[in-house]
Amino acid sequence: MRLLSTSLLLALAFAPAPDAEAQLAAPNADGITYGHVHLNVADIEVHKKLWVEYFDGVVVEKGPLTTIRLPNFLIALTEREPTGPMQGSVLDHFGFKVRNTAEFVARWRAAGMEVGPEFIGAEGMPNAYVMAPDGVWVELQEDPSLHVPVAGYHIHFITPDYEELLAWYTQVFSLGVRPRGRIGTTTDVPGMNMSFGDAEEATAATRGRALDHIGFEVDDLEAFCRKLAAMGIEFDVEYREVESVELKIAFLTDPSGTYIELTEGYDKY
């Protein structure tokens, strides 16, 4: 893990809490919206401060669960040393829109954190990659018209079977295929674009890595789980209610090894 500089830790410790409210997108006609990404991190306090300071997040804690609320999705945190970074797994990175990519990158670099390639992205706008602690790989895309400083935008799967994986998601979650700029193999769920790209070699399953799993928020989750079971979908964790965190949950794994949590209740966080 790349260590944060002392100056960054001090800046984060005294950073004011953001004023803007953040929430999940309204669900589609099937009651589905994008929910969260769940990260395994070595130091939960470092991540709490980082996602607030740089991404305008709001910390929400319920029982043993720590989350960061952001426009369009949440980041859930578990304090556990990850088994590997995001890169090399099926879920290569997740992305945000920002008002000014260069300004964001300058702040990130000044804090002593790693900046990856800077380039013109698939939609013709300035993009950049930044590396957060624990191998969390994040893409930034500029959007000067953004009504908030930062908003969740996409998650990116990388696998040799990317076309089949896209078809699986569109079938299971009743989604349509829609290009994102030059990338033709993408789909949208409310709040998040899901992009799918090729890999020369097989990529690893996500469970245990820096990004452990992704999540969808579902109205009437119990009924949705019955629907998936009727389609032949097998669950790693069957539908259940977890009162301590005020969530209804279920877990499954996609054909590529991406671990998926289905939730009902994150829209109240």
Question: What feature does the model see in each segment?
Answer:
Residues 21-29, 32-43, 67, 83-157, 180-181, ...:
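Vicinal oxygen chelate
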Residues 5, 26-28, 81-86, 144-146, ...:
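Short, flexible, solvent-exposed loop/turn segments with mixed acidic/basic and small polar residues
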Residues 5-17:
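Bacterial N-terminal signal peptides
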